[in-house]
Amino acid sequence: MRKYRIVFQKAFKSQMIYRAATLSSAASTLLSFAIQICLWHALLGTGLQSGTSFTDMVLFVIVNTFVSKLTRANIATTIEAAVTDGSIAMELLRPISYKYYLLANIFGKNAFSVMTNVLPVAAVGAFFLGGAEAPEIGSVLAFLVSLVLGVLLMFELTYTFGLLAFRIQRCWFLSWYVSALTTFFGGTAVPLWFYPKALQTVSYVLPFRYVAFEPVNLLLGRTPAGEAWVPILCALAWLLVLGLLDRVMWRSAVQGLTVNGG
């Protein structure tokens, strides 16, 4: 664990160098938050739509912003570059797992992004949540467990798709596919509450809704704390399936690896 902690710390500190980029990213995130809040306020006002209030949507946007910033990764491009220039050979010689090295490196960079981008958004969002009822303790605990699983699930998704870079010469589009599928079937832009029944049914058999949508459901009490085991169990099942799948893909990729460059 100490090795991965060092990787995490170095990745976190490396982001402190780019001050202008940090400021522009924070401003962009705040602007995006403001636009979404204005849109939902125009659509919902102070009333209810399909049982959804404006404060529900504020919380929804804050949680989605947190998850998106914490799980942002372009693993496919990282692996593609390493295979192309031959540096993947050195990566495989490290006395640590390449998967968990990527995990520590990504979370180190993204943790800095959460601090500089999400905390200001949460502070602004708190003004809109002033009159909201506090969630029950059981819902909060279920939310935290589900959120941790959702973050890990999103990493597994990006990592599994990223391993395709060993087989595909140009894979810039893979991250776009992951993002598009998560946005549509994960309900990160428009909540699944507003989807047609058919699409909601499809989303239940895919992993994307368990990344951020189900944690928000638990926090808002739409999924009672007593039924929290259902989405949590589904997230665990998907983590197991993707974990087994990426292990098979990794072994196949390493066995058939041809290093270019050097």
Language-model segments: residues:
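Hydrophobic transmembrane alpha-helices and immediately adjacent juxtamembrane helices
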Residues: M1-G262
